[in-house]
Amino acid sequence: MHTTGWVTVIRIDLHTHTYRSGDAKTPLLEFAECAIGLDLIAITDHHDLYAAGILREQFSLPVIQGEEINTGQGEVIGLYLTESIPRLLGLAETCKRIRDQHGLVYVPHPTDTSRHAIGIERLANLCQRNLVDIIEVGNSKSAHIDRQAEVLARSFELPVVAASDAHVAEAIGSSFTTISRLPNDASELVTLLLNSSYHHQAFDPVRDATRTIILPSNSGKS
């Protein structure tokens, strides 16, 4: 929690990765140490829910359990998930399964052609079908704000955020969003984000690109 004058703001980073993603290297202890300046953080490893529970229970981090999912038509993130969602289900089905868990559909790096973006046309289609809750317009792995996605989000009255997409510990919180208080649940987070501010900083240091294969953990999967 941060106070500027008489105003209290809550800093949140809704797109981060730990070593469980396979293409990131951050151990959980180091992750917890680097997340200290944040008031709420979403753990969104690729196809894995293990780290969020450990960071909450063993390190007392205020976390949202999430997952970045390869739909076969680009990536989406599910927030407030209780169960992992299979990959390659297609965009619409993946979004519906997130909603079935009372989770939030978060679209990361929507038009970034260097990554698994869904693209502006598919994003517009999902918005028209009321299958999107949050759109990421600032990502620390990009030098620019996604103005095209931001205009689309505003036209559908959807909240926009900036997030780090941290794959190394020092990137955690490099881009973030501020809200007025901590949310009690998923729907309240969306409401708070409609009156939020985002802060974007490009931050993409060189990292080891060697991919680590993560085996399932009986204790970590919900």
Where are these regions (language model features)?
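Charged catalytic cores and adjacent phosphate/nucleic-acid-binding surfaces used
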Residues: M1-A24, L28-A32, Y50-I54, Q58-Q65, ...
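Divalent metal-dependent hydrolysis catalytic cores, especially in the metallo-beta-lactamase
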Residues: D13, H17, F31-H47, G103-Y106
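Secondary-structure boundary/capping motif
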Residues: L38, K96-R99
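Short beta-strand/turn micro-motifs composed of small residues
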Residues: D45, H109, S164
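Acidic/Gly/His-enriched mid-domain segments of enzyme catalytic cores or analogous surface patches
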Residues: Q101-L104, P108-T113
